């Protein structure tokens, strides 16, 4: 992967670019004028990343920015990855772990609307109130999400799906998301050990359900790298081999129908369980591709 130039995999399908120092107007114009879904990877690392490592590699904690307005997860590690002049106003949380959720960071970038699972809504309200008071910033509107109930957020249709993950709150239902716009159906899945049956059914990718509908794009966590398929974290996270297996099944059952040449993007990669970006670029099985901090991808419909 050329990390400093446009990556053209299919003229009609996908555009990816490395965007260190990107101008806000470029990002905004692409998001507003496109009939696709623009994703900027703010961070692609798992919880064990903390700055540049001994190899010179650096991944911030996992977070994405959708169409310049909507964040999915956000922590202080990603504050420097928001393009200058871009002002996200909304955040969607997958769960309450500290490598995904930080109320102070959300308030500092100007978030006014927060969406998260109703199973920890009261906790989040309390913590956001404390953060808002500490920073002397306005309290955002916090909306509880319910599994399977789609909501409209900044021109996106977002459907919460149950994840296979656990937090310190045994009653919390962690989430992954189906994100839809202009024919794009993106599965954003982190943190989760595979795709739970209920999530597959709701998203339309369970082959048992003949009325299902294919997804067209995938961003999936790969906490564990190649050779770590039997890692102890496999109940709550997914390996590279696990993602590849999921993709094969979805392709075989025709429940994943991407534009020609479009990769499946990996995120949430553990520092101790993966090689360098260059090693991942050359060593991952097709169609998997390791995302990196600052990567932008324009997903388009088939």
Model-derived features with residue positions:
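Active-site metal-binding motif and surrounding structural segment of the metallo-beta-lactamase
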Residues: 74-122, 212-218, 223
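Conserved beta-strand hairpin/beta-sheet module of binuclear metal-dependent hydrolase folds
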Residues: 32-84, 172-191
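Active-site metal-binding loops of divalent metal-dependent hydrolases
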Residues: 44-46, 69, 75-76, 96, ...
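Cap/insert and terminal regions of metallo-dependent hydrolase folds
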Residues: 195-298
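Metallo-beta-lactamase
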Residues: 26-36, 119-175, 180-182, 288-297
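Divalent metal-coordination and catalytic microenvironments
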Residues: 39, 95, 158, 191, ...
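N-terminal export signals
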Residues: 5-26
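Structural beta-sheet core signal
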Residues: 91, 187-188, 266
